[in-house]
Amino acid sequence: MHNPILLTAICAVVSFFIGAIPFGLILGRVFNHTDIRKAGSGNIGTTNALRVAGPKVAALTLLLDCLKGAICVLIARPLIADLGHGFPVSIMAPGAAGDWMLGVICLAAVWGHIFSPYLNFHGGKGIAVGLGVILAWYWPIGLSLLGMFIVAVAITKFVSVGSLAAAIGLPIAACAVFPYSSLGLKFCMALIGITVVWAHRANIKKLMTGKESKLSFTKRVTEPDDQ
């Protein structure tokens, strides 16, 4: 297939549906016979899986959500490289003609997770799947954002603060590291950051009112959080 727009659209749709797989919900039901949407924040991501179902389910959720994001990029990369634009398959050099294509793939996977069609277009908050796509897209930026996340959580004890820091840092890092990348790529990275911040709107409200829960590896919750 040599039509870049059609190929990107097909890869984006596939990535959206892969990104939409609700591993947190599936693992909670398999290992704990629990619907993690019924307690805590009601989210299907790693943090709520930890709070409701425990460290094992949370670790597996984190791993699988990261992997599904990475897989979307790793599948699309050689297909896009085969278009004949001369992209190096190992890097897909941001700044090359067509670098926006992988940006669209990254965005589609994150949107699939946040707006999962399997859950009536509800889902997670995009952090783990976002980490997966960015590590697969350009791992130095992914590791930098992960480091930013870890430092922010270590200082504040709030996972949401680390998540927001990483989300805001993504478009900044992408523009700083690749100032000559296409406007399309920059736009996709900005949209990922904006969407992840939007997905944390309830957390932002809780942080402002002092109701946000701090990270705990031992405390379990069985009831929905107070909003």
Task: Name each region found by the language model.
Residues 143, 159-166, 180-192:
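Loop-to-transmembrane alpha-helix initiation sites
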Residues 130, 177-178, 185-186, 190-198, ...:
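Long C-terminal subdomains/extensions of small-metabolite kinases
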Residues 2, 18, 23-73, 114-127, ...:
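Interhelical loop and helix-boundary elements at the membrane-water interface
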Residues 122, 146-150, 182-189, 206-213:
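A cytosolic-side transmembrane-helix exit/cap motif
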Residues 12, 16, 61-65, 69, ...:
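Alpha-helical transmembrane segments of multi-pass membrane proteins, especially transporters
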Residues 15-18, 77, 108-113, 149-153, ...:
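Alpha-helical transmembrane segments of multi-pass membrane proteins
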Residues 1-10, 74-104, 135-141, 176-188:
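Helix-coil boundary and interhelical linker segments in multi-pass alpha-helical membrane proteins
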Residues 50-55, 76-79, 108, 125-156, ...:
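Interfacial segments of multi-pass membrane proteins
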